[in-house]
Amino acid sequence: MNLGLAIFLIIIALLVGATAGFYGARAYMKKYFKENPPISEEMIVAMMSQMGQKPSNKKVHQVMNMMKHQQK
């Protein structure tokens, strides 16, 4: 009986640890990408310039807002 209880507790501990690790890593990555977006305003300006568009502040902010809403 003690062996069965030990195996049961080990399995429960592994499941709880895996679940906590998953949600902890998920929260960390959300916070990281919010603080350090994968693309910056300077990169958007350079991209628009390469495509032949004149990068106004309004267009740059629209693109940044669209990207922020997609991350949520």
Swiss-Prot record:
Which InterPro entries does the entry link to? UPF0154
Topological category with respect to the lipid bilayer:
Single-pass membrane protein
Transmembrane residue ranges: 3-23
Location comes to:
Cell membrane
Q: Which UniProt keywords apply?
A: Cell membrane, Membrane, Transmembrane, Transmembrane helix
Its GO CC terms are: plasma membrane
Which Pfam families does the entry mention? Answer: UPF0154
Q: Which family does it belong to?
A: Belongs to the UPF0154 family.
Protein name, UniProt field:
UPF0154 protein LBA1278
Q: Which organism is it from?
A: Lactobacillus acidophilus (strain ATCC 700396 / NCK56 / N2 / NCFM)
Question: Which taxonomic lineage does the organism of this UniProt entry have?
Answer: Bacteria, Bacillati, Bacillota, Bacilli, Lactobacillales
